[in-house]
Amino acid sequence: MTTKPRHPEKVNKPLNPIKKKPDWIRSKLVNSKEFFLTKTIVNNNNLVTVCQEANCPNITECWSKRHATFMIMGDTCTRACAFCDVKTGRPGKLDSLEPVKIAEAVKKLNLKHVVITSVDRDDLDDGGSNHFFEVIDQTRKRNPNTSIEVLTPDFLRKGDAYKKVLEANPDVFNHNIETVPRLYLKVRPGSRYFSSLELLKNAKLVNKNVFTKSGLMVGLGENKEEIIQVMDDLKAADVDFLTIGQYLQPSVRHHPLDRYYHPDEFKELETIAKSKGFLLVSSTPLTRSSYHADEDFAKLQLNRINNH
C-alpha cells in the first residue's frame, strides 16, 4: 500500500537543496514535564496544532511553557503555498465538537492567552468563519479571563465572511502577509497580496478595538526596499503589530531558501519598522506569529495606553 504524499502538488517540483543552518538559528531543546503534559492534552483531545503541522522550530520551548497554537478545521489545507509544511489536499468534514475540545484544552493548560489558527478551507461557503466564531465563543465562555488571538486565512472570494470572526470579538486579529508582492505567484499562488492588505484594513474598520497583526518571512528572495514597502503598506492598513522571521525551508520540494539573514539585519528591520509607527514589532530569526504571543499581547495593551 502506497502512502499518499503530504504535498502531492510538489511531487514533480525540482529539488532545492537545503542550506545548512547558521549557529543563530539553533532552537532550544527542552523536554520538561510541562512539555509532555502539553503534548498529552493535545493528543488526548485529538487536537491539531500548527506547532506540529508546520514543523515549528520553537515547539519545545513553547510547549514547555504550556503554550500551544491550536489549528482548527483539520490538518489538511486547500491551498498549496510553496513555503508551508502543512498537508495539502481535500479536507474532511468539520468537527462540531472541536469548539468545546479547544475550550477545554485551554482550561486544562490554564492559558492566559491562546492563539487559534486554521488551515485554508476554500471548500466551505464561508471559508470556515462560522466555525471560528464557535471556537472563540466556546473558549471565552469556559475561559473568561483568557485573551484570544486568531490567525486567520484570507477568506478570499468569501465576501463579508471575515466579519463573523470579528463578531466573536477576538482580542487580536492576525493575518499574515507572508512575503513581498513580487513573490506572491511563486510563494502564495492561491492568495492575493492586496486582498490580504484589504482584509487587515477592514478588520480594524469593523472592530476598532481589536489589535491587528501581520507577519512577514525573509529569506525567500526579497530585497530590503521591498520589505520596507510591505511595512508601509501594512501601516497604511492600520496594522498594530508586525512580526518578521526567517524562512526555514521545510524540504527539498519547497520554495528554495535564498539566504539566512543575520540577527543584526533583523535588528535593523525592527528599528525601521518601529520608526514607521507600529505599536509593536518583533523581528528575530526565530520569530513566528504566535511566538511569545502572551507577553506581546501585554506589551500591545500597554503601548496602546501609552500612545493615547
UniProtKB/Swiss-Prot annotation:
Binds 2 [4Fe-4S] clusters per subunit. One cluster is coordinated with 3 cysteines and an exchangeable S-adenosyl-L-methionine. The lineage of its organism: Bacteria, Pseudomonadati, Pseudomonadota, Alphaproteobacteria, Candidatus Pelagibacterales. This is Lipoyl synthase. SUPFAM superfamilies: Radical SAM enzymes. [4Fe-4S] cluster 2 binds at residues 77, 81, 84. It comes from Pelagibacter ubique (strain HTCC1062). Its cofactor is [4Fe-4S] cluster. It holds the Pfam family Radical_SAM. It catalyses: [[Fe-S] cluster scaffold protein carrying a second [4Fe-4S](2+) cluster] + N(6)-octanoyl-L-lysyl-[protein] + 2 oxidized [2Fe-2S]-[ferredoxin] + 2 S-adenosyl-L-methionine + 4 H(+) = [[Fe-S] cluster scaffold protein] + N(6)-[(R)-dihydrolipoyl]-L-lysyl-[protein] + 4 Fe(3+) + 2 hydrogen sulfide + 2 5'-deoxyadenosine + 2 L-methionine + 2 reduced [2Fe-2S]-[ferredoxin]. Keywords: 4Fe-4S, Cytoplasm, Iron, Iron-sulfur, Metal-binding, S-adenosyl-L-methionine, Transferase. InterPro entries: Aldolase_TIM, Elp3/MiaA/NifB-like_rSAM, Lipoyl_synth, rSAM. Transmembrane segments: none annotated. Pathway: Protein modification; protein lipoylation via endogenous pathway; protein N(6)-(lipoyl)lysine from octanoyl-[acyl-carrier-protein]: step 2/2. Its EC number is 2.8.1.8. [4Fe-4S] cluster 1 binds at residues 51, 56, 62, 290. HAMAP family: Lipoyl_synth (MF_00206). PANTHER family: LIPOYL SYNTHASE, LIPOYL SYNTHASE, MITOCHONDRIAL.
